């Protein structure tokens, strides 16, 4: 009962955001007339899947080979382009022109550590174009072409679209596409761009674990349940914790690793056999793309078999130099090779639990998604963490994400009818979003794990007298200083009426839409002038390693961050006091006509010395700034008090004015 009250209370706290979600939801329904049939696509690293909501239920659609999941592979031969099974099946004989794992490149920068690592592991060529990873490949007639990751992803999306069209007997233009929950803005934008290239209107981007939760919870009626979705796929890993209550799916927390999955486990098997071959045969096959292609295929097959068997034999005919390869691989060896990677999955689980504020015994169901969750060791680690609780195996781990996306498609198109009319999806932003204020401080507007869609406004002011332009620098990250966060984009708001510092009011509004994509607007309240920016994938977004580093460092260096922020605040307090004092003694409406000449001279001298000291002591400690403020106050405050007493007004120094929080705004 207490849990129910706690959840109700939190839903009240989210009332405004919830209203926003409901509003967005109602808009989606209004737009339903404009949308045709909306398919749901799980665009996976290794496999993709498509579904549609039809006749009151979801149909997962089989491809032209009769398979319900399609390899996310593309290949070029002298005669044609191949997608899916056809591409994967010829990989061993055409390795340099067969492209896979492109989801690991999408929305990333060429210099990302993960991209550089993948560059060494894949047989095709990854090149740098405008700071982004592109794939260089020979297409027909020896012509070389470079493709962006979005273009390759679009080819896979096109295949899924055509699969749905063949089944439905009509053209499809609208889709819901899923992404890992921990995908950042650049990766989401790039995925939407891939949809556009494929001729699709991506009506909604939704998070994979949330889609899986819909698949699990669609027919679950009755009371409130806390569920943990553990989504370990071919290339990405997500953990999301949700509350399901009569059709309302509210995400409480999400965490993950956008570069961890089954492909990494395959790679460990390959590395093991490469060493074994070198030892037994004195042959290094690590640069032989044909041999590696054959080995990769068998490593994946062996991994799958070891989920149900304790030993397999890896056999490859004519692996190199006419030598046939045949070696056993036990489940114990496989687990030993990947032990650190398996254990790595527990970190995001713990973090998500902390962020959700839940105890282990408050999780009602653990839902497994993604083919890699079939690995017994992964299931065992999860079971051990939750004190023996058995994971729920009621959803198909390969199809659950596409299933949930298809349900969302049914809601958007209106084809869901009564079965889906009560479903409301409340997802979250995975990273804190904010802007830079004076001293390089990260002023946070939208904290991580805030329910989306959401909108937050805050009023800021100018830092200098007569300032007519402010630069709005937008960051994401968990640290308190922007130098430790990631710049997403910046823009200038110009034409602000000249005024003393602290006078203009500039309202900055952050809006995150239902796809998790950010729009920022700045408006000068006096003139009504405004500028805005949509953060897009050309702004150089975070890599997963950077996200993890930021969160980890935020925890490790929280105390250090606090000290640096206190130092900046102390400097700003001193600076604000000095400027306020100078403004007052020169303003006829304030103190200019009430001061004796020697009093004015004392204040001018004290404030001038303080400003010179500030210029010479840019990196002073908090205590130094506090001490200097006391020195200036010791000169100025008695004079101000005397002036007020002479004029019969209430005493009160500029210090009190400068320290009032009610009307103060951070300076840009």
UniProtKB/Swiss-Prot annotation:
<dbReference type="GO" id="GO:0016020">
    <property type="term" value="C:membrane"/>
</dbReference>
<dbReference type="GO" id="GO:0005788">
    <property type="term" value="C:endoplasmic reticulum lumen"/>
</dbReference>
<feature type="compositionally biased region" description="Acidic residues">
    <location>
        <begin position="657"/>
        <end position="668"/>
    </location>
</feature>
<keyword id="KW-0732">Signal</keyword>
<dbReference type="InterPro" id="IPR018181">
    <property type="entry name" value="Heat_shock_70_CS"/>
</dbReference>
<dbReference type="GO" id="GO:0051085">
    <property type="term" value="P:chaperone cofactor-dependent protein refolding"/>
</dbReference>
<dbReference type="GO" id="GO:0005737">
    <property type="term" value="C:cytoplasm"/>
</dbReference>
<dbReference type="Pfam" id="PF00012">
    <property type="entry name" value="HSP70"/>
</dbReference>
<feature type="region of interest" description="Disordered">
    <location>
        <begin position="645"/>
        <end position="668"/>
    </location>
</feature>
<keyword id="KW-0067">ATP-binding</keyword>
<dbReference type="GO" id="GO:0140662">
    <property type="term" value="F:ATP-dependent protein folding chaperone"/>
</dbReference>
<feature type="glycosylation site" description="N-linked (GlcNAc...) asparagine">
    <location>
        <position position="617"/>
    </location>
</feature>
<dbReference type="GO" id="GO:0042026">
    <property type="term" value="P:protein refolding"/>
</dbReference>
<dbReference type="GO" id="GO:0016887">
    <property type="term" value="F:ATP hydrolysis activity"/>
</dbReference>
<comment type="similarity">
    <text>Belongs to the heat shock protein 70 family.</text>
</comment>
<dbReference type="GO" id="GO:0036503">
    <property type="term" value="P:ERAD pathway"/>
</dbReference>
<protein>
    <recommendedName>
        <fullName>Luminal-binding protein 5</fullName>
    </recommendedName>
</protein>
<keyword id="KW-0547">Nucleotide-binding</keyword>
<dbReference type="InterPro" id="IPR029047">
    <property type="entry name" value="HSP70_peptide-bd_sf"/>
</dbReference>
<keyword id="KW-0256">Endoplasmic reticulum</keyword>
<comment type="function">
    <text>Probably plays a role in facilitating the assembly of multimeric protein complexes inside the ER.</text>
</comment>
<dbReference type="GO" id="GO:0005524">
    <property type="term" value="F:ATP binding"/>
</dbReference>
<dbReference type="GO" id="GO:0005634">
    <property type="term" value="C:nucleus"/>
</dbReference>
<dbReference type="InterPro" id="IPR029048">
    <property type="entry name" value="HSP70_C_sf"/>
</dbReference>
<dbReference type="GO" id="GO:0030968">
    <property type="term" value="P:endoplasmic reticulum unfolded protein response"/>
</dbReference>
<dbReference type="GO" id="GO:0044183">
    <property type="term" value="F:protein folding chaperone"/>
</dbReference>
<dbReference type="InterPro" id="IPR042050">
    <property type="entry name" value="BIP_NBD"/>
</dbReference>
<feature type="signal peptide">
    <location>
        <begin position="1"/>
        <end position="24"/>
    </location>
</feature>
<keyword id="KW-0325">Glycoprotein</keyword>
<dbReference type="GO" id="GO:0031072">
    <property type="term" value="F:heat shock protein binding"/>
</dbReference>
<dbReference type="GO" id="GO:0034663">
    <property type="term" value="C:endoplasmic reticulum chaperone complex"/>
</dbReference>
<dbReference type="InterPro" id="IPR043129">
    <property type="entry name" value="ATPase_NBD"/>
</dbReference>
<feature type="short sequence motif" description="Prevents secretion from ER">
    <location>
        <begin position="665"/>
        <end position="668"/>
    </location>
</feature>
<dbReference type="InterPro" id="IPR013126">
    <property type="entry name" value="Hsp_70_fam"/>
</dbReference>
């Amino acid at each position: 009962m207490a849990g129910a009250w706690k959840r109700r209370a939190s839903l009240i706290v989210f009332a405004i955001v919830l209203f926003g979600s409901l509003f967005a939801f109602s808009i989606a329904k209004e737009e339903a007339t404009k949308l045709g049939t909306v398919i749901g696509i799980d665009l996976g690293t290794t496999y993709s899947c498509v579904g549609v909501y039809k006749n009151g239920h979801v149909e997962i659609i089989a491809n032209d080979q009769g398979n319900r999941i399609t390899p996310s592979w593309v290949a070029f031969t002298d005669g044609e382009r191949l997608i899916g099974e056809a591409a994967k099946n010829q990989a061993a004989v055409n390795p340099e022109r067969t492209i896979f794992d492109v989801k690991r490149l999408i929305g990333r920068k060429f210099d990302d550590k993960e991209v550089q690592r993948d560059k060494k592991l894949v047989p095709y060529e990854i090149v740098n174009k405008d700071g982004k990873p592109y794939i260089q490949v020979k297409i027909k007639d020896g012509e070389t072409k470079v493709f962006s990751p979005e273009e390759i992803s679009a080819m896979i999306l096109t295949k899924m679209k055509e699969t749905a069209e063949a089944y439905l007997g009509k053209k499809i233009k609208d889709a819901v596409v899923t992404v890992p929950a921990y995908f950042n803005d650049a990766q989401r934008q790039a995925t939407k761009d891939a949809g556009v290239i494929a001729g699709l209107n991506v009506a909604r981007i939704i998070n994979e674990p949330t889609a899986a939760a819909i698949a699990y919870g669609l027919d679950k009626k009755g009371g409130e349940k806390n569920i943990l979705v553990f989504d370990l796929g071919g290339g990405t890993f997500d953990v999301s914790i949700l509350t399901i209550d009569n059709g309302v799916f509210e995400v409480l927390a999400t965490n993950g690793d956008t570069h961890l999955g089954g492909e990494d486990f395959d790679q460990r098997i390959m590395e093991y056999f490469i060493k074994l071959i070198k030892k037994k045969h004195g042959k290094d096959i690590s640069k032989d793309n044909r041999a590696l292609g054959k080995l990769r295929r068998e490593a994946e097959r062996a991994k799958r078999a070891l989920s149900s068997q304790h030993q397999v034999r890896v056999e490859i005919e004519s692996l190199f130099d006419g030598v046939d390869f045949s070696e056993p691989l036990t489940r114990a060896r496989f687990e030993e090779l990947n032990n650190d990677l398996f254990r790595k999955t527990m970190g995001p689980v713990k973090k998500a639990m902390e962020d959700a504020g839940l105890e282990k015994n408050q999780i009602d169901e653990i839902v497994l998604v993604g083919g890699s969750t079939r690995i017994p060791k992964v299931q065992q680690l999860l079971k051990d963490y939750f004190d023996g609780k058995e994971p729920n195996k009621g959803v198909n781990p390969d199809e659950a994400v596409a299933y949930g996306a298809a349900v969302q498609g049914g809601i958007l198109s209106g084809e869901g009818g009564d079965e889906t009319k009560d479903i409301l999806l409340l997802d979250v932003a995975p990273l804190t979003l904010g802007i830079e204020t004076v001293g390089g401080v990260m002023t946070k507007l939208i904290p991580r794990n805030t329910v989306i869609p959401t909108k937050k406004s805050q009023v800021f002011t100018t830092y200098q007298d007569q300032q007519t332009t402010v630069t709005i620098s937008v960051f994401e990250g968990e640290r308190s200083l922007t130098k430790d966060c990631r710049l997403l984009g910046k823009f200038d708001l110009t034409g602000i009426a000249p005024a003393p510092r602290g006078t203009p009011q500039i309202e900055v509004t952050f809006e995150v839409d239902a796809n998790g994509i950010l729009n920022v607007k700045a408006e000068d309240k006096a003139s009504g002038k405004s500028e805005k920016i949509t953060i897009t994938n050309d702004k150089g977004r975070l890599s997963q390693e950077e996200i993890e580093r930021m969160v980890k460092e935020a925890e490790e260096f929280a105390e250090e961050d606090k000290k640096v922020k206190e130092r900046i605040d102390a400097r700003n307090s001193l600076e604000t006091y000095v400027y306020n004092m100078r403004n007052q003694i020169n303003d006829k409406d304030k103190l200019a006509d009430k001061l004796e000449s020697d009093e004015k001279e004392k204040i001018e001298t004290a404030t001038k010395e303080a400003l010179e000291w500030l210029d010479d002591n840019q990196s002073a400690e908090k205590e130094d700034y506090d001490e200097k403020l006391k020195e200036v106050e010791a000169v100025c405050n008695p004079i101000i008090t005397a002036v007020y007493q002479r004029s019969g007004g209430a005493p009160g120094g500029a210090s009190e004015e400068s320290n009032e929080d009610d009307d103060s705004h951070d300076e840009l």
